Amino acid sequence: MKKILTVCVAAFLLVGCDDLFTPAIENNKQVSDGLNDPLYSEGILANAYTRNPYNSQSFNDVATDDAVTNQTSNSYLKMATGSWTSNNNPMDQWGSCKAAIHYINLFLAQVDQVSWANDPIVNKMFCDRLKGEAYGLRAMFNFYMLQAHAGYTEDGHLMGVPIVEEVETETSNFNYPRNAFDECIQAIYDDVQKAEDLLPLDYENISSDSEVPETYRSEGANYSQYNIVFGNNFRTRMSGRIALAFRAKAALLAASPAFADGSNATWAEAADYNGEILDLIGGVAGLAANGNTWYKNADEINNLTGGSNPPEMLWRNGKDATAYSLEQAQFPPSLYGSGQINPTQNLVDAFPMANGYPISDAASGYDAQNPYTNRDPRLNLYIVVNGTTMGTDGKTIDTSADNTSNNDGLNRENGYSTRTGYYLRKHLREDVYLSSTTTSGQPHYSPRIRYTEIFLNYAEAANEAWGPTGTGTHGYSAYDVIKAIRQRAGIKDENGNDPYLESIKTDQTKMRELIRNERRLELCFEGFRFWDLRRWDLNLNEPAKGVRISGGTYQVFDVESRTYNDFMRFGPIPYSEVVKFDALEQNVGWK
């Protein structure tokens, strides 16, 4: 079958009556038309790029113990409170990722036949780069499918997703069985290796012929030709570094408790793959000093040009020059926002004291009647608590139940006020101005992969593989990474030390708990908690809690239950797919 790709064009004017009865010129193209139209062929690959689930923020933290929402129609709210089924799945990646892989396979089937440039050397480089992008993207989409849909079947086998690497036609057998989980991990690794062989680590202009890779220099390529294909203009595309990051993410998933028994993966392998990326930036010394405030580093954001990355970003979305929609959705009502995402008391309690001790530790100095005093500075960066000042006018936010002067108080107005006593602060630029009559936006971008994630991946895997202070071949340990992250956050006692970290540095179990908690804090509201709880085999049903502040007292209360069945540690295969294809086994527990 010749795959038909249709472009719909709307006609706004009718010139004459005859036009009504004249057949319109068809604007349909065959895939094969791309052989002489490189822009069209590249558009097939571009279709896959548009399906990256991290092209925008989802705030699926609402489906965890870290947040609730005041939007009653929110799909994650419904999911967390009993409405998650195999045909109603807000976390589904099956349809979009399979479609992306289909387009990638179409592209790979013809990329070698397309005339990308008149110059044969430039043509070869374009062909290599685009193939490398396709392999890297296929690895990425298989990772996201695996994360969302891998699981144990009724016969006790850990299964992944069908591995599809050929073009599907009308004669294809679509009734594929699922591949084993470890086969899917290997397929990701294989595609990453192909991408690494074809792509530069990063897209950067070079200034001399001696810098041209030998593969192309031996064929006569000069630096000017190289820059046309592999230069700065392509910085936002799949690169060797990005592909390696998806191998590292897949390795961590495979080594995690929920998957380890059926994956043949090791923590050492996960540590090495993540460490390989960190070694490229100098290890712990490469931790960006302002990486934990990436969303509000105004000068850094405002000056981003040409796909360049801040030190914290391994891969990011494009910059929106004058945005304010996030602030409209998340600012408290007194700042003309809708306060949609409400962090929980559960998450607030996870932030330690400024001296580094958990608030449950007797040495912490925590005062339940002054709960926000002397806390980890990240609490005030990421969450609006009672008494926070924010916005262009430095407004004090009153989240108490006693507040009758505006709708910032607890449960004052449905759809606008906080349900937990807290509002979201992370992601927001407080130099955005909103009012009833005018708005003034500011540049924003969102991350796809932060280096902090890779550091935390490494710390988790290194602790499991070699203990808290073991370094493997990388020269730095889980302890070293966590120490650097907490120092960046401002964790220190009166002597500038981190006594809690020092007290647990030889205890693998306590270090594991600390690493998981640091991951929870550093990556909150970035789409990690939902998946982390599952791969760690932790309790999915911690009630989401809030705080009622009245008369100067703080009363913690249950805001919303979580009603996940135990089998919901693994997501479902879509019901529509299981019904159509009897070779496709459903994960245990799902219908």
What is each model feature region?
Residues 1-27:
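Bacterial Sec-dependent N-terminal signal peptides
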Residues 58-74, 150-165, 201-242, 256-341, ...:
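Short, surface-exposed recognition loops and adjoining beta-strand edges that mediate ligand/DNA contacts
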Residues 17-63, 88, 114, 351-373, ...:
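Membrane-proximal, proline-rich intrinsically disordered regions
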